[in-house]
Amino acid sequence: PTEVYLQAFGDYASGRYQSAVLGFETFLQRFPNNSYASNAQFWLADCYFNQQQYALAIPQFERVLNEYSAAAKNPEALYKIAIAHLQLGATDEARQTVDILNQRYPKSKATQKAQELVIP
């Protein structure tokens, strides 16, 4: 399983997001309970985010939160959801997401970054 994950992450790190999406999806289908699964889900979502496919990124980041509630990347997932909502013009959703981030993870770096977001 580690090999599949590392190949997908290598594609992600090199900006080959479409290949990375396929790799992370394969990893998650084959090894859903692996210790790397929460990271794979986050990076899968981030592939869509980095391609500015925000409507696809949001539900993938939400899966990080819903399926891996203790994942270390949850604050960053919420931050990226807020940015994706902003990019889609959904300011109310962005504001709500930042509020959730503040409540759940008040001392995280993602929360600090979210304070700098300008939400109209």
Q: What annotation goes with each model-predicted range?
A:
Residues P1-N33:
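Alpha-helical segment of the N-proximal tetratricopeptide repeat
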Residues R30-Y36, E67-K73, N102-Q112:
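Short solvent-exposed coil/turn linkers within tandem alpha-helical repeat scaffolds
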